[in-house]
Amino acid sequence: MRSSLYRLGIVLLSVAAPIETGCAQTLLHLPPADRVRLAEGRQLATRVCDRIWPGWGQTKFQVLLVGDSAEFLVAPERHPRGFTPLGHDAVLGAEVWTRPRQFSPDLLATFPAVGGVPTVVIGSAERTGKSSTAWVLTLLHEHFHQWQFSQPDYNGGVSRLGLARGDTTGQWMLDYPFPYDSAPVQEAMRSLAAALVQALEAQSETRGRALQAVSESRDRLRKLLTADDHRYFEFQLWQEGGARFIQYAVARAAAATGEPSADFRRLPDYEPYGQAAEDAIRGLRSELEKLDLARQRRVAFYPIGAALALLLDETREDWKQEYTRRPFRLPDLASAGR
């Protein structure tokens, strides 16, 4: 039986843009700015992945860049069907293949798009509305999803959550009927978000109490949810909140490991990684303060999960091992900082 992740990929394929045919429609080279960004992302992954997360650096990094008329497959795991080889790209340090565009050029997702392999499918920085630095950090966010999906029991574990309710496409991951419009759940979510802001800003002498308040808020929310709703909530915190945390961690690690390439720094919208990390944390606090479950739906879970992961990173030495051993739920917070 094919995995839910594979079936979700089929859903995305079914809504992809029509294939454009004809040699004139197909670009035979990567646009220069896209090559520079991809090269920076690949080099950054080599520098920081294993510093940030045990074993992440061993994860395959297959990327499908979606241009306006062509797609470029970078570092495929195996010979891809339906693609034309462009050869080894010395800047990227990888083989590159191309085909006419199939996916929307503003897509940002990771799923088995090519050869059944979890693939980062990503439009250009311009098409996705991101600066070059933000685009690279998003690329690493999606690369962490590749690590998640590569875990030995990912597909089996997702199936055992029992949340599909007859869906065979994987669409339930996006459309699960969580009680977004419940007033008590909305209030509990706002309380949890407020407690997370307080904990992120707490000084050492008040950190223990602030963490306890987060744990109590998390427990109050759990009591309002059915068992299925709670499993879905925790699954989203683990998967999407964890990947959002990775963006902050990558920005911090990148700032500490030297400057990016001169070509990347010359891009007109380049922002230093240290500044990007500071902006991201400020943005996270703003998201938590303005959290609106009824309007944001599933996306409201992302800053909650990211904030919990940041606190775990400060309070539990073993949280990454626990995250891997017991997937689909973020570990509990420690009672005080380490």
Identify the function of each model-found stretch.
Residues 25-94, 243:
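N-terminal mature-domain "stem" immediately C-terminal to a signal peptide or N-terminal signal-anchor/transmembrane
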Residues 150-213, 218-222, 229, 233-279:
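Post-HExxH zinc-binding segment in Zn-dependent metallohydrolases
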Residues 82, 96-117:
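Catalytic zinc-binding patch centered on the HExxH motif and its immediate surroundings
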Residues 254-314:
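Extended hydrophobic/aromatic segments used for targeting, binding, or gating
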Residues 137-149:
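Active-site recognition of the HExxH zinc-binding catalytic motif
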Residues 124-139:
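Short pre-active-site segment immediately N-terminal to the catalytic Zn-binding motif
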Residues 28-50, 94, 281, 292-295, ...:
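Non-catalytic terminal regions of proteins
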Residues 9-20:
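Bacterial N-terminal signal peptides
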